[in-house]
């Protein structure tokens, strides 16, 4: 029963389950029964896998948004990572709904006239979605934390990660520095929205970045 109903939301539960599966495989190894051999071939699937949907902002904010929104609206346990470059990177750096207001990119040479679509806010409005932003170059411990929390949440999870791109116009050798500046300037605030905190009577919103200390240039 422990093998079938093991709690594997946290790392300790997964480690315990690996131990149970190892014991099961040891016992099955001594049997020549076809059913035992069949079970041994699939026993490792009793260990919970970490599965993520990964896509860029062109997919998440624009051409694939309808499907993404449908998934987030449902109560299923699914993890989604959006790598947000704020432009259509694969096709040369054109303006997208992820591009912030005033930004210069292809198709908005005079500066984008409309605001960036707030994907994280839209997702958090559902109330049952775990939502977080991340920028590992600015705060790697926060990035690790949001992945851990998203993985452990029994429902839809969305992480929107700031992703430097050559279309931004700087040498990619400095991508971590650019992430740091994006957070320090307030361009990319780091936060978490965890519905579990609301269920416990607390505030589900946690701001992980400090007040802006750098100008936006």
Residue ranges and their predicted role:
Residues 137, 143-217:
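Glycine/aspartate-rich loop-and-adjacent alpha/beta segment that forms the canonical ThDP
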Residues 1-8, 75, 174-179:
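Short intrinsically disordered, low-complexity coil segments enriched in acidic
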Residues 1-38:
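N-terminal leader/propeptide and maturation segments of large enzyme subunits in energy/redox metabolism
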Residues 20-29, 37-40, 119-128, 134:
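An acidic, phosphate/nucleotide-engaging active-site surface
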Residues 62, 70-78, 82-98, 103-117, ...:
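Residues forming the flavin
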Residues 31-94, 131, 137-150, 154:
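Thiamine diphosphate
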Residues 5-9, 45-47, 99-152:
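Conserved thiamine diphosphate
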């Amino acid at each position: 029963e422990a093998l079938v109903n093991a709690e594997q939301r946290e790392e300790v539960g997964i480690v315990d389950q690996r131990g149970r599966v190892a014991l099961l495989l040891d016992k099955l190894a001594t049997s020549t029964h076809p059913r035992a051999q069949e079970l041994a071939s699939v026993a490792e699937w009793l260990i919970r896998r970490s599965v993520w949907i990964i896509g860029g902002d062109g997919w998440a904010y624009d051409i694939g948004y309808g499907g993404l929104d449908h998934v987030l609206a449902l109560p299923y346990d699914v993890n989604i990572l959006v790598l947000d470059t704020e432009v259509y990177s694969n096709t040369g750096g054109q303006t997208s709904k992820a591009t912030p207001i005033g930004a210069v990119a292809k198709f908005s040479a005079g500066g984008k006239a409309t605001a960036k679509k707030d994907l994280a806010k839209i997702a958090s409005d559902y109330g049952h979605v775990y939502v977080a932003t991340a920028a590992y170059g600015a705060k790697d411990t926060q990035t690790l934390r949001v992945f851990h929390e998203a993985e452990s949440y029994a429902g839809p999870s969305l992480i929107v990660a700031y992703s430097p791109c050559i279309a931004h116009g700087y040498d990619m050798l400095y991508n971590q520095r650019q992430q740091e500046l994006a957070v320090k300037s307030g361009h990319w605030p780091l936060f978490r929205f965890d519905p579990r905190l609301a269920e416990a009577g607390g505030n589900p919103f946690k701001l992980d970045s400090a007040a802006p200390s750098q100008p936006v240039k």
